[in-house]
Amino acid sequence: MLDLTGTPDTLAAGRPGKVGLLELRYVRVGGRTELVDRYQKSPLQIMRPLYIDPSRPDLPVTYLMSTGGGIIQADRNRIDIDCGPGTSVHLTTQAATKVHRMEFDHATQVVNLTAGQGSYVEYLPDSLIPYRDARFYQHTQVTVDPTATVLLGETIAAGRLARGERHAYRLLYSDLEIRRPDGTLLAVDTVRLDPHGPGPVTGPAVFADHDLMASLYAVTPLAPADRVADTLHEALAPTGLAFGVSTLPDDCGAWVRVVGSDPPALTRAMRAAWDALRWSLIGVPAPDLRKT
């Protein structure tokens, strides 16, 4: 990725509008969770948290948004989210994250998510869509207290499928680390998608002949890891999609990876998995979150 660093003919990294910052802090106030601190710098911003989950009126839903209509060359974004003790939060995006074509340099996004003691956090952004010649690196660092629960999702598309673009991006790298507050490593997911590299992105261990790849992690003390894995398997088995489920170390949870080529079918499958986890862990269904 460093080999692609250069001076673009548009606004360079570090210029106004190129460094997006979003800092959010949630605390439990009375009987519900509230956003008490917010700092945002364009192109990143949020919609005011909404209490629209009928089964969990204490849980705010926060939509992460971009004023720029997507990620463009030389963007440097950072999102820091601190969910304090006893909080319950759902975080998602307003729509898919579009990574636009780049002729110079690259774009990066760093996400730091902290789940405090006894918290319940859902971070479920919509899909990431890399356009032709996109160059993008994302690093997600999740710190989870042993008494906290985090549901974390990610979906990557092969490109603008409606336009026939499949793996026309230049590079797409993504690193995920899940740790305890003392630094103990629970999970690492390293994705290196380079259509021009030695390992084909359409290989059997990557996309194979599919157009979409999604992952869902459930780190929780609310149920044994085997039961979490069984919940995911039972939710996804009827979908007909290819998927694999595995438990995480130290009985801390489970995760699943799903591949497919029909965006609505994959979206329904991931929602079914999310809904099943909610019923199993907190006894309520997933809400209907309408998006544009």
Task: List each language-model region with its residue ranges.
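N-terminal, charged/glycine-rich beta-strand/loop interface patches
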Residues: 1-127, 132, 139
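Structural motif
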Residues: 88-90, 120-122, 149-151, 214-215, ...
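Short, surface-exposed recognition loops or helix-turn segments adjacent to catalytic cores
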Residues: 126-128, 153-158
